[in-house]
Amino acid sequence: IEERLVGSEMCIRDRVTVFAEGCRGHLGKQLIKKFNLNKDKDPQQYGIGFKEIWEIDEKNHEEGLVMHTAGWPLDNNTYGGSFIYHAENKQVFLGYVIGLDYQNPHLSPFDEFQRFKTHPSIKKIIEGGKRISYGARALIEGGIQSLPKMFMPGALLIGCDAGTLNMPKIKGSHTAMKSGILAAEAINEHIQSKKDLSLYEELFKKSWLYKELYQARNVKPSFNWGLILGIIFTGID
């Protein structure tokens, strides 16, 4: 692997290399292409998520409250939604995620997030408050249909380098950790008992992680029919 990826500048000497670069990992993408790991898989999909932490007025704070929304300010054909978590110490975690497969070339994800905060239900929460931190990151949204083969000679992909994010829940930390645990178990068997690294994928398909991603497999694709039909189908499914 080191000859194909980094040439003579760096020599990686180990039995198994675990790639955990996160969404759009540079080496992970090269490995997927080189070893054709995404053969017969759907193209990977991506989104962008914005998050702000606000310190708000005590009267507007309800510790433990969780809110999720879909739709506005996006139109019915653009995938996206928000999250609002009322944390401790009068803090609110406020965020918005937009799928990067939107069709309108004039759409600005950042500006849509700012518009979202003008909604009366959101404005009343943060009014009089203070934004204390902010950030943005890419999200991997393809789900299990886009998940590549996660093993190859001498290497494994874990977490968002493979694409284990649970998109409907916008949660990927627990899935990344579980994939890392499964990778460690497979590597141990590979070293101790000479088991093939394909064991990693076998363990994955027997785990709660696979079940969780499988259950969420139709949520993102269903929104290709628009917001209303997507919500109805997701509820039925």
Identify the residue ranges that each predicted region occupies:
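Flavin (primarily FAD) binding-site architecture
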Residues: 19-35
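Single conserved hydrophobic/aromatic residue that forms the stacking wall/gate
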Residues: 1-7, 11
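FAD-binding beta-loop-beta segment adjacent to the flavin cofactor pocket
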Residues: 136-167
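Active-site-proximal substrate-binding core of FAD-dependent oxidoreductases
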Residues: 163-169, 181, 185-228
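Central beta-strand plus flanking loop segment that forms part of the substrate or channel wall
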Residues: 33-65
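Conserved FAD/dinucleotide-binding core of flavoprotein oxidoreductases
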Residues: 76-135, 174, 193, 197-201, ...
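Rossmann-like NAD(P)H-binding beta-loop-alpha module
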Residues: 59-80
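Short hydrophobic core segments
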Residues: 12-23, 155
